[in-house]
Amino acid sequence: MLIKHLQEHFFRELTKTEHLEKIKEGTLPYNRLMSYYKCAIMEVETKFKVLNEQFSLHYDENPIEAIKSRLKSPDSIMKKLRKKELPFTTDAIEENITDIAGIRVVCSFEEDIYKMADCLLQQDDVTLIERKDYIKHPKESGYRSLHLICLLYT
């Protein structure tokens, strides 16, 4: 009975407007950061769709089979920060986690992967930070892919 009373009291206190406002204030910087990454995903997806369309017009081919994107979940971000013994702040996230947003571009042919990567990297608002070529150097598991970590200027 006492535990139930304490739970109800705790819930009433937490859901008071002033507490909810503090929670919103605390999560606002994180939500802004995630919104930035969502917009970056949309922008890069659009870049690839435009490239695919240009290839269709000029070369009568569509090198891109599929485009999929993802935003790392808050739980996954927190686990990564904990593993690195870093605080849960937007600064720590921005400075230490490079895979918050990800886009997978699937091409039918290996040479198309490199063509698309080159076309993306030739754009003025995209800067390559790191390249991991698991096609030329597959992982022991057989995994083959080209990873590009890029900075996007918006």
Task: Label each region the model flagged.
Residues M1-N96:
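Charge-rich, low-complexity segments
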Residues A101-C107:
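Short cationic amphipathic helices and targeting signals
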Residues Y153-T154:
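Conserved small/polar residues in nucleotide/adenosyl-binding loops
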